[in-house]
Curated annotation (Swiss-Prot):
This is Non-structural protein 5. Its cofactor is Mg(2+). Pfam families: Rota_NS26 (PF01525). One of its GO terms (molecular function) is ATP hydrolysis activity. The keyword RNA-binding applies. The modification Phosphoserine is found at S67, S153, S155, S163, S165. Plays an essential role in the viral genome replication. Participates, together with NSP2, in the formation of viral factories (viroplasms), which are large inclusions in the host cytoplasm where replication intermediates are assembled and viral RNA replication takes place. Orchestrates the recruitment of viroplasmic proteins such as capsid proteins to these factories. Participates in the selective exclusion of host proteins from stress granules (SG) and P bodies (PB). Also participates in the sequestration of these remodeled organelles in viral factories. InterPro entries: Rotavirus_A/C_NSP5. Its main location: host cell. Mg(2+) binds at D92.
Length: 197
């Protein structure tokens, strides 16, 4: 996108401020001095005021407006800064002003060049595979298979032998049934814990 504006053909402005030449301002940028002076050329504004006041309101038309009147024309002189790769910034000036022959034909040149190139080619390829293969994970391979513990031996008909008793004193004691019930519950709890692990 490029934007170009012709500064030399701006509309005219009528004001009493433009009687005197403005002082040139100097700014410093990266150690280099860049100057710019602007000069506004305007005739006596009092003569224009007398001219406008001497006419009746009915006689004032578009040709008497401030933008089209020769008395309010001005020009801007600016110093052009030239750059040199070896010498840096120099203060050689180039003066350019608007000619007075274009009074009444103020124009603002506004050119807009805009180029947009859009490549909207879109290619998409979607493939969906529904084949599902179940593979054993490393955790399954590393898991050890413990032998299942059966509790069929714990029954009411089981009779303690001499090796399970304390000197054979508990072979037919009254706590035999409670002991085997407790032993069965403990074994089931142990089996459940092993399965959970």
């Amino acid at each position: 996108m490029s934007l170009s504006i012709d500064v030399t053909s701006l509309p005219s402005i009528s004001s009493s401020i433009f009687k005197n030449e403005s002082s040139s301002t100097t700014s410093t940028l990266s150690g280099k001095s860049i100057g710019r002076s602007e000069q506004y050329i305007s005739p006596d504004a009092e003569a224009f005021n007398k001219y406008m006041l001497s006419k009746s309101p009915e006689d004032i038309g578009p040709s008497d407006s401030a933008s089209n009147d020769p008395l309010t024309s001005f020009s801007i002189r600016s110093n052009a800064v030239k750059t040199n790769a070896d010498a840096g910034v120099s203060m050689d000036s180039s003066t350019q002003s608007r000619s007075s022959s274009n009074v009444g034909c103020d124009q603002l040149d506004f050119s807009l060049t805009k180029g947009i190139n859009v490549n909207a080619n879109l290619e998409s390829c979607i493939s969906i595979s529904t084949d599902h293969k179940k593979e054993k994970s490393k955790k399954d391979k590393s898991r050890k298979h413990y032998p299942r513990i059966e509790a069929d031996s714990d029954s009411e008909d089981y009779i303690l032998d001499d090796s399970d008793s304390d000197d054979g004193k508990c072979k037919n004691c009254k706590y035999k049934k409670k002991y085997f019930a407790l032993r069965m519950r403990m074994k089931r709890v142990a089996m459940q814990l092993i399965e959970d692990l």
